[in-house]
Amino acid sequence: MIQFKDSYKHYGANGREVTALQPLNLEIRAGEVFGIIGHSGAGKSTMLRMINRLEEPSGGHLLINGQDITVLDRMGLRALRRQIGMIFQHFNLLSSYTVAGNVAFPLKLTGASDAKINARVAELLAWVGLEAHANTYPAQLSGGQKQRVGIARALATRPQILLCDEVTSALDPQTTSTVLQLLARINRELGLTIVLITHEMDVIRRICDRVAVLDTGRLVEIGLVTDVFLHPQHPTTRSFVMETEHIDTSALDQDFALVKGRIVRLTFIGTDTYLPLLGRVARETGVDYNILSGRIDRIKETPYGQLTVALSGGDPVAAQAAFAAAGIHIEELRA
């Protein structure tokens, strides 16, 4: 649906050229929730804003439904933007307009009749749970309510694509969960393609189908969230995962020094997460196991579990083979 073909962005600064986004090639599929993660300055906002040409690409091509948007004239660009909604980090609401007025604003720009605007606004406010606040002004709302107004406004013109620019970074954890649940519902029930940027891997884990990792303007990793989250390849990705998992590597090293045997990390995905595989393999191979750390959680709707265990006695090699035969991913941390 959205294709970046050698798309890049350069800026001029103090007489020299700065690369914000190096030539990028990737495709975002229709109907998916696609996450873009990176540290500040990685190029994720630039990439997101190129999709509706709030940032003009310096070169390459950017296709939406097969149409190269880099060659659109003003009228074509206006039509394109009606198909793309956008939600902002700091809400960007009009302070002098009521909640209903903010949601109605993009519809007024299309020239829709008052009757159609009023009906659509009422529908959207009910959808995001703000029908009781139609005549309230933004200053009277909480952060989560403001973001729900922003979401309703972004949906006003019935877009096909929803761009989310750090939409949870200004929210508390409980409100973040509410907003992510609303976005998941939008994707599920309305079928919108959602492109979301964040610096929080936990947001990616909870809502996205696939993720791209950017580092200083370069795409360094891309794939299904289950693959990227559980088996990160690039150092930048690994650092995001470790921050999310709250892994203290120095503490782990101390734990490793206190135990004997082969140390492995086992990753279980799906229904395997709830099976007693560790005990079964221990009985079959005669190994003793010592659990050093572990967790069970979900990546979107998919359950997963990770255990770091020390294997000793019996036949550790046979134990690893048995885990592999059961479809469990094994990472050897110490032989």
Swiss-Prot record:
Q: How does it sit in the membrane?
A: Peripheral membrane protein
Give the EC number(s) listed in the UniProt record.
7.4.2.11
Reaction catalyzed: L-methionine(out) + ATP + H2O = L-methionine(in) + ADP + phosphate + H(+); D-methionine(out) + ATP + H2O = D-methionine(in) + ADP + phosphate + H(+)
Q: Where is the ABC transporter domain?
A: 2-241
GO cellular component terms, alphabetically, are: plasma membrane
Cell inner membrane as UniProt keyword: yes
Location of the protein in the cell: Cell inner membrane
Could you list this entry's UniProt keywords, alphabetically sorted.
Amino-acid transport, ATP-binding, Cell inner membrane, Cell membrane, Membrane, Nucleotide-binding, Translocase, Transport
Q: What class of enzyme is it?
A: translocase
The intrachain disulfides are none
Carries keyword Lipid metabolism? Answer: no
User: What InterPro entries does this protein's entry cite?
Assistant: AAA+_ATPase, ABC_transporter-like_ATP-bd, ABC_transporter-like_CS, ACT-like_dom_sf, MetN_ABC, MetN_ABC_transporter-like, NIL_domain, P-loop_NTPase
Residues holding ATP: G38, H39, S40, G41, A42, G43, K44, S45
Q: Indicate the family of this protein.
A: Belongs to the ABC transporter superfamily. Methionine importer (TC 3.A.1.24) family.
Q: What does this protein do?
A: Part of the ABC transporter complex MetNIQ involved in methionine import. Responsible for energy coupling to the transport system.
Summary of subunit composition and partner proteins: The complex is composed of two ATP-binding proteins (MetN), two transmembrane proteins (MetI) and a solute-binding protein (MetQ).
Q: What is this protein called?
A: Methionine import ATP-binding protein MetN
Q: List the gene name.
A: metN
